Structures are given as structure tokens and as C-alpha cells.
């Protein structure tokens, strides 16, 4: 594993430890060069309560690796969280910089009604 990925995973571990202490559901984001994924995970970490990604049938058309697609995923995860009765989450960016696609997803989720 290269140093850049190790540093990202180290940041992610620290953030997840702090989120675990808070005892709230977390909005976990994972990004690849082609897709972006979002999951709302229960406070104990044992269950996925809602999920959305650019692989969903409704979002698959068009480009999937840009900020516009990430914003659509953010809006969709906020909608699915409301259906599951979740309004407050902790944002887990998995060590990725809060910039670009990660920021677009977070902003869209906030606009959709999620608080973090």
C-alpha cells in the first residue's frame, strides 16, 4: 500500500473513533475515480440504514464521476434517510479531502434535510 493511501486510512480511523464516541448514525462516503457511494450506518456500526450511489438505476445515465453526479447521490441519500426516519448524522468522509465530489455530496445532503 502506498503512503498516500495509508495516510488517508489513518485519518479515516481517527475520525471513525471520534464518531463512535458520539453515538450517532454516520454518513459514510466512498469515492472511486468512476463512482461515488454513500451509506448511513447505525451507531453500533452493525447495520446499513440507507444507501445511494451512482450505480443506482435512476442515476446511472450520464456521467457518474463528477460533482453533479455526487450532488444527485447526496440528494438521494437525504431522501432515503428521511424515509428511514433519520435526520441527524455524523459525516464520515473516510479520510478524503472535503473538496470536489465529497463536498458536493455533503452540500446536497444538507440541502435535502440532513443535519451534521
From Swiss-Prot:
One of its GO terms (biological process) is translation. The keyword RNA-binding applies. Keywords: Ribonucleoprotein, Ribosomal protein, RNA-binding, rRNA-binding. InterPro entries: Ribosomal_uL18_bac-type (IPR004389), Ribosomal_uL18_bac/euk (IPR005484). It comes from the Bacteria. SUPFAM superfamilies: Translational machinery components (SSF53137). GO terms for cellular component: cytosolic large ribosomal subunit. GO terms for molecular function: 5S rRNA binding; structural constituent of ribosome. Part of the 50S ribosomal subunit; part of the 5S rRNA/L5/L18/L25 subcomplex. Contacts the 5S and 23S rRNAs. This is one of the proteins that bind and probably mediate the attachment of the 5S RNA into the large ribosomal subunit, where it forms part of the central protuberance. Belongs to the universal ribosomal protein uL18 family. This is Large ribosomal subunit protein uL18. It comes from Chromohalobacter salexigens (strain ATCC BAA-138 / DSM 3043 / CIP 106854 / NCIMB 13768 / 1H11).
